[in-house]
């Protein structure tokens, strides 16, 4: 690519990334030279403003984009799929910033300025991952998100638990990155290119040439490495310790934004790269046979391990970590194998999970701060101290359990119906059984709030900002549970969810 080619691109489609990069750079300099005079709250609100402006430009791109647009020999691809995930990332980061504005007032994080622009750099990494069409840019985005997350988890420097969780996160993440890179090296060795859309055809040729075992090995290593990002089995063991030790806004950032970024990677790397590979007999495709079976086993293991291990937890954040492992299993179900509507199912589920997770963790943050404990007993008698908080938390838990009428019910319902369409009855059965198991620990929290006496009857003092945020999340959870068509129709209109699996050509060749 020549220098003149750089100026021939329409760079407006990358404005959301440029805005986040610009705000992160500007805020780091502002914190360095004027942080004490301005105050850290100003930096927080400016970070929030940056995410809102970037989201506006993503929406503008959605309306202006008629077909995928690529940059730098297809290294970056702007398309409906990437834009949908970017909106999830931006909303998740904006919500994390909003609850952080209240959380960080207590001084639990010493370097509050760094905290906000580290969130933005992590967001930028996730956005790059969503638009990557090349293994190099994909890995750069992955590391940008990962390194930012490592630092965010350990920002409570005076907390032994936070330091321990950060150390475990770095070690586990480094191992997962090494495994992922090992899988990428196999892919590059077989394909001779790092362009994901070209890899799809090169791997098919390698499989037909007798290198199927190496192709399958590459798939296995990539799957194990990506399992870390979405906290799915067999690479899930870091999640409970990290969720417990990290600041609560960082915990929910990892639970939503980092997990969603991992699923964006699964599509870009796993589905596209291995889409055209034969299953060895010439009668089918590897991804729809052996590859889907592998992901199905990951999904089943995640649902079973996550829900059964959550039964034993007394710490609410650890319980939510195991719940998140189970949610990763549910989200893997549409990929086993994918149908033409898998995109709608994944995005709708992530949308509902976004609302419910941020609402639930906001309540956990308020209760744990007032009670000075994150144990279940801290929720005892919550209904008598703050009926609104108790009702809101009940709504979030019912949604996670998949109870009508909540957004979580329809999220699981769409996933379940998708499994029936492709006749994955064994996976549908595991979904039902593990969902029933989850009722026990979700209703355990509800039982504490309504049926157990608390240590005090004094009304709970909830900051107005966080109170409003929780109330909005609760209303949205019920509203979109009652009218799910508003979201699904929007997805179908703006994001072309009926993905044409037979058209896997790179943008330049379409």
UniProtKB/Swiss-Prot annotation:
Record keyword NAD present: yes
Task: Cite a GO CC annotation.
Answer: plasma membrane
Major localization class: membrane
Keywords in alphabetical order: Cell membrane, Membrane, NAD, Quinone, Translocase, Transmembrane, Transmembrane helix, Transport
User: One GO MF term, please?
Assistant: NADH dehydrogenase (ubiquinone) activity
> Does Transmembrane helix appear among the keywords?
yes
The protein's matches in InterPro entries, at most eight in alphabetical order, are given as: NADH-Q_OxRdtase_suN/2, ND/Mrp_TM
- What reaction is this protein's catalytic activity? a quinone + NADH + 5 H(+)(in) = a quinol + NAD(+) + 4 H(+)(out)
EC number(s) per UniProt? 7.1.1.-
Return any one Pfam family short name.
Answer: Proton_antipo_M
Which biological processes are named by the entry's GO terms? ATP synthesis coupled electron transport
Q: Which residues cross the membrane?
A: 14-34, 42-62, 84-104, 113-133, 135-155, 170-190, 208-228, 247-267, 286-306, 323-343, 346-366, 390-410, 426-446, 466-486
Could you say which protein family the record assigns here?
A: Belongs to the complex I subunit 2 family.
**What does this protein's UniProt record list under function?**
NDH-1 shuttles electrons from NADH, via FMN and iron-sulfur (Fe-S) centers, to quinones in the respiratory chain. The immediate electron acceptor for the enzyme in this species is believed to be a menaquinone. Couples the redox reaction to proton translocation (for every two electrons transferred, four hydrogen ions are translocated across the cytoplasmic membrane), and thus conserves the redox energy in a proton gradient.
Per its record, how is this protein called by name?
NADH-quinone oxidoreductase subunit N
Q: Which organism is the protein's source?
A: Brevibacillus brevis (strain 47 / JCM 6285 / NBRC 100599)
């Amino acid at each position: 690519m020549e220098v003149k080619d750089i100026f021939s691109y329409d760079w407006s489609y990358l404005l959301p990334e440029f805005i986040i990069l610009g705000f992160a750079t500007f805020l780091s300099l502002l914190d360095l030279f004027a942080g004490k005079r301005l105050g850290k709250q100003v930096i927080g609100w400016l970070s929030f403003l940056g995410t809102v402006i970037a989201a506006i430009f993503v929406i503008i791109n959605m309306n202006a984009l008629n077909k995928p647009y690529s940059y730098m020999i297809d290294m970056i691809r702007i398309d409906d799929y990437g834009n949908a995930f970017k909106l999830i990332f931006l909303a998740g980061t904006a919500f994390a910033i909003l609850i952080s504005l209240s959380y960080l007032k207590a001084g639990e994080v010493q370097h509050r300025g760094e905290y906000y622009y580290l969130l933005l750099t992590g967001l930028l990494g996730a956005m790059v991952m969503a638009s990557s069409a090349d293994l190099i840019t994909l890995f750069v985005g992955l590391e940008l998100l990962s390194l930012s997350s490592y630092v965010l988890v350990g920002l409570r420097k005076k907390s032994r638990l936070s330091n321990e969780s950060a150390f475990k996160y770095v070690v586990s993440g480094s191992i997962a990155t090494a495994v992922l890179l090992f899988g990428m090296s196999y892919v590059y060795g077989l394909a001779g290119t790092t362009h994901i859309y070209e890899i799809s055809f090169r791997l098919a040729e390698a499989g037909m040439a007798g290198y199927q075992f190496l192709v399958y090995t590459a798939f296995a290593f990539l799957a194990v490495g990506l399992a870390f990002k979405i906290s799915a089995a067999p690479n899930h063991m870091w999640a409970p310790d990290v969720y417990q030790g990290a600041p609560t806004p960082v915990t929910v950032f990892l639970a939503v934004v980092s997990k969603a970024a991992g699923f964006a990677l699964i599509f870009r790397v796993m589905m596209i790269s291995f889409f055209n590979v034969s299953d060895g007999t010439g009668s089918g495709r590897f991804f729809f046979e052996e590859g889907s079976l592998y992901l199905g086993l990951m999904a089943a293991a995640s649902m079973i391990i996550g829900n059964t291990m959550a039964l034993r937890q007394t710490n609410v954040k650890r319980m939510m970590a195991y719940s998140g492992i189970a949610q990763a299993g549910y989200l893997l179900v549409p990929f086993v194998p994918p149908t033409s509507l898998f995109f709608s199912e994944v995005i709708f589920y992530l949308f509902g999970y976004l609302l419910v997770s941020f609402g639930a963790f906001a309540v956990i943050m308020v209760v744990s701060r007032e009670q000075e404990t994150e144990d279940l007993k801290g929720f005892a008698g919550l209904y008598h101290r703050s009926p609104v908080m108790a009702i809101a938390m009940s709504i979030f838990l019912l949604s996670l359990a998949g109870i009508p009428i909540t957004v979580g019910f329809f999220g699981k319902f769409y996933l379940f119906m998708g499994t029936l369409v492709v006749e994955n009855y064994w996976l549908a059965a595991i979904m039902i059984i593990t969902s029933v198991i989850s009722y026990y620990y979700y209703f355990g929290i509800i039982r504490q709030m309504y049926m157990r006496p608390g240590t005090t009857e004094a009304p709970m003092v909830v900051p107005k900002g966080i109170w409003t945020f929780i109330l909005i999340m609760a209303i949205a959870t019920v509203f979109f549970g009652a009218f799910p068509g508003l979201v699904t129709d929007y997805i179908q209109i703006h994001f072309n969810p009926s993905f044409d699996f037979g058209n896997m050509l790179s943008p330049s060749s379409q």
